[in-house]
Amino acid sequence: MKATVIVTLKPTVLDPQGITIQRSVQSMGFPGVTDVRQGKYFEVNVSDNTPAEQRKGIVDRLAREVLTNPVIEQYKVVWEQ
């Protein structure tokens, strides 16, 4: 089963890369774009033989302990159907 882990900076953390992209977007004439935040995207495959609750726990732990810096980042897990 495939899980997508999306990691972003917490809203209270300054995102200098997002700010730079936002400035470029404005100077290039893209109307209505008011904010850009940069993040990371991970695809994680867990064996279908692993029980569903265990799969969720594995990916959650992986996201918390390996894929993110919990001080400045947050994450969301999306499971593929």
Give the ranges of each region predicted by the language model.
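Short glycine-/aliphatic-rich beta-strand segments at the starts of folded cytosolic domains
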Residues: 1-11, 40-43
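Short, conserved charged micro-motifs
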Residues: 14-16, 50-57
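N-terminal glycine-rich anion-binding loops that anchor highly charged ligand groups
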Residues: 31-37
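Positively charged, solvent-exposed patches that mediate nucleic-acid binding
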Residues: 43, 47-49
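C-terminal structural segments of small proteins and small subunits
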Residues: 53-81
